[in-house]
Amino acid sequence: GWAVPFAQQSAETWRRAFEVNLTAPFVLTQACAEALAKSRCGSVINIGSIYGLVGPDWGLYEGTSLGNPAAYGASKGGLAQLTRWLSTTLAPTVRVNCIVPGGVWRNQDQAFHERYLKKVPLRRMAIEEDFKGAVAYLASDLSAYVTGQELVVDGGFSTW
């Protein structure tokens, strides 16, 4: 199971989370690396998570069906390190960065939503539109001298 207590989190769930969040970006970047290098302006943009930066606040989840399994944060933290590793390995012809989103509104439980808003200085959860500027920036020449970085787009969640 995914949203279950730590003692019930399975190795299979752990493996699948790492497959999706860490192995897939590794394999995809590896498959594209030569073409990106030939372009001499390649840009890889990974998608991390605030839970790759900070530990979970369990109070957000109390009384809801939501959870925060160990595999999620660990795999997203690993993706941040893979981003840094790839940025030095694929340089100077390919830049590699990571967007780190905060909570995204997906009709979560009302109690979770209300608690989450109190943790965010901007007092709202993100919507997909909130990330387009970060993606455009990292994909463009505006970030020609930016590599190996995590661009946090979390409404201020991680500032407290």
Residues covered by each model-derived region:
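A short, exposed helix-loop element centered on a Lys and neighboring polar residues
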Residues: 29-30, 84
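Short C-terminal tail/terminal secondary-structure segment
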Residues: 56, 63, 136, 147-160
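Conserved SDR Rossmann-fold cofactor-binding beta-strand/turn motif
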Residues: 46, 95-105, 139, 152-154
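Short, small/polar-rich loop/turn modules that mediate ligand/substrate recognition or access, typified
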Residues: 41, 91-95, 146-148
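A hydrophobic alpha-helix adjacent to the NAD(P)-binding/active-site core of NAD(P)-dependent oxidoreductases
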Residues: 6-9, 17-18, 116
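Catalytic loop of short-chain dehydrogenase/reductase
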Residues: 1-13, 37, 45-91, 103-104
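A conserved structural motif in NAD(P)-dependent oxidoreductases
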Residues: 120-131, 142
